[in-house]
A protein has these predicted regions:
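Active-site region of glycoside hydrolase catalytic domains
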Residues: 292-428, 437-457, 480-483
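Substrate-binding cleft of secreted/luminal carbohydrate-active enzymes
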Residues: 427-504
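C-terminal motif of bacterial Sec signal peptides marking the signal peptidase cleavage site
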Residues: 20-23
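Acidic/histidine-rich helix-loop elements
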Residues: 188-216, 244-248, 287, 406-432
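An active-site-proximal structural segment forming one wall of the substrate-binding cleft
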Residues: 211-232, 242, 246-276, 283-317, ...
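Extracellular mucin-like PTS domains
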Residues: 34, 38-163
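N-terminal carbohydrate-binding accessory modules
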Residues: 154, 158-231
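Bacterial lipoprotein signal-peptidase II cleavage site
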Residues: 25-32
Length: 516
């Protein structure tokens, strides 16, 4: 799915979800702490490189581009026992601000409400929107077959894996590990929020709450596990509090680690990625050296921070941004630039594997998730997409599913399509099974595990019955082909972050039934 269209899902959902507090009760207080006083130089890491400014994705007239300004060197002094003063950068401002101390408990938290302006503007089956994360939803053509393909449900893993000499890393294949995950859910619109230019004094918590989420507590995370989910995908925008030399603020890293810790302690798997991250991805075709330097620094730091974590933590190379329409537009009918665009993604994914494998600790054996081309099924199954070389053979591929986009994305008609309010015809089901059979044949049958890192549907113009039918059908058909389905969710759409439970019990039951 392409990244522009999923913005519309979130933009449609967000107004009803912008909350003012987190009221979830906790057995113990969860505290977020930051240094007593850290000076923040609000200048982007790119400001010294004079990269031409592109319009932000919050501007609906642009195509997911963002100002990658000049790079300015700053020295970051870190100690474990003293206060730290560091020059840091944040998007689009040159004023100096103070990164004030935050002390937040689980029972009393103010969540920042953000008003986002959304405009659907697309051409050739694309919708550009704002407010949240971005996705391109493309409707993959169904196979020309006249009957729906059938798939035999694979057998479950026969025996429990043994633990290797490396602490926390079991002798388990990635295919077995993905199967063990079961079904999952995303912690969406939380740690990946970005472009929060309305926040004058950016802090860890202000980013976390900028798109409507309350401060995440341990009880919220435990609630996902109690619902029955086996894996929590944690999207992260790492550039939010980053110095000019691409050093991630230690408090930002600590907060991600805290949420990962809660996830693992609850018994779930965790997936951590680079998620959109303010749009610098768009510059890879024109400034690959600079972008690759930033990408490398981010993954070096993540790998180091989590190097001793067990195999229940998986890294994902990127989100949906691996595809560049400035080089190749699939709707143009031309193949010019296609090989180059695929080549950039293949290079990024190989760099990702190489960085993690050389990082030490448990990383040489860590299971990794490789983002497909725009995480689109049809494009990821293209022969130009190549899985990276990995001597450990511990890589899975990630695809997303928002097909048909007129049903999953649109809540009202657009110039590229008519909003669809129902799903479930023989043609609809065949499209789903054809797409998943394609993934199975291209990857699963060749020994490459698959995680459906996102699937979802806008809810505003659909009945609960239609929402249940679509989501449960995707989960069931995916799981029956050994694909792990991970539901895209943002604050209080499906999971209530105040009550720490799933809002529609019948929908949850049907999704979990995919495993039976």
């Amino acid at each position: 799915m392409n990244l522009n269209l999923k913005k519309l899902i979130a933009a449609i959902m967000v107004p009803a979800m912008l909350l003012t507090s987190a009221a979830c009760s906790s057995e113990s207080d969860a505290e977020i702490t930051t240094p007593a006083e850290v000076t923040v130089d609000v200048t982007t890491p790119e400001e010294s490189e004079q990269v031409s400014e592109e319009s932000s994705p919050v501007d609906s007239s642009s195509e997911n581009t963002q100002t990658e300004k000049t790079e300015k060197t700053s020295e970051t002094t870190k100690t474990e026992e003293t206060e730290e003063t560091t020059e840091f950068s944040e998007v689009s401002s040159e004023e100096t601000t103070t990164f004030a101390e935050e002390t937040t408990t689980a029972s009393t938290t103010a969540a920042t409400s953000a008003t986002t302006t959304t405009t659907a503007a697309t051409t050739t089956a694309e919708a550009t929107s704002t407010a949240t994360k971005t996705t391109e939803a493309t409707t993959t053509s169904a196979a020309a077959a006249t009957t729906a393909a059938t798939t035999t449900k694979p057998a479950e893993t026969a025996s429990a894996p043994t633990t290797s000499p490396v602490s926390g890393m079991r002798q388990i294949t990635t295919m077995e590990l993905v199967r063990e995950m079961g079904v999952g859910i995303n912690l969406g619109n939380t740690l990946e929020s970005c472009h929060v230019t309305w926040i004058s004094n950016p802090t860890v918590s202000s980013f976390e709450t900028a798109w409507g989420s309350p401060i995440i507590t341990e009880d919220i995370i435990k609630g996902y596990a109690k619902c029955g989910f086996g894996v929590l995908r944690i999207p992260v925008a790492w550039s939010n509090l980053m110095s000019a030399d691409y050093t991630i603020h230690p408090d930002y890293m600590a907060r991600v680690k805290q949420i990962v810790d809660w996830t693992l302690d609850s018994g779930m798997y965790a997936i951590v990625n680079i998620h959109y991250d303010s749009g610098w991805w768009s510059e890879f075709p024109t400034n690959k050296e600079k972008c690759m330097k930033k990408y490398t620094r981010i993954w070096e730091q993540i790998s180091e921070a989590f190097k001793d974590y067990p195999d229940k933590l998986m890294f994902e190379s990127l989100n949906e941004e691996g595809g560049w329409e400035s080089l190749w537009n699939r709707w143009s009918g031309s193949t010019n630039g296609k090989a180059e665009s695929f080549g950039i993604l293949n290079e990024i994914n190989q760099k990702f594997v190489d960085i993690v494998r050389s990082a030490g600790g448990n990383n040489p054996k860590r299971h990794l998730l490789i983002a497909g081309y725009n995480t689109d099924i049809e494009l990821t199954c293209d022969s130009l997409f190549v899985m990276p070389s990995d001597k450990e053979n511990r890589c899975a591929v990630s695809v997303h599913y928002y097909t048909p986009s007129t049903f999953c994305i649109l809540e009202e008609d657009a110039d590229w399509g008519k909003a669809k309010t129902d799903w479930g015809s023989a043609e609809d089901v065949k499209e789903l099974t054809d797409n998943l059979n394609k993934v199975k044949a291209h990857f699963i049958d060749k020994g490459i595990p698959v995680i459906m890192g996102e699937y979802g549907v806008s809810t505003g113009n659909k009945t609960p019955e239609m929402i249940r039918l679509f989501l449960s059908s995707v989960a069931k058909e995916a799981y029956s082909r050994q694909i792990c389905p991970v539901l895209w969710d943002i604050t209080n759409v499906f999971y209530d972050r105040q009550q720490c439970n799933f809002k529609d019990g019948e929908l949850l039951r049907q999704i979990l039934a995919a495993k039976s």
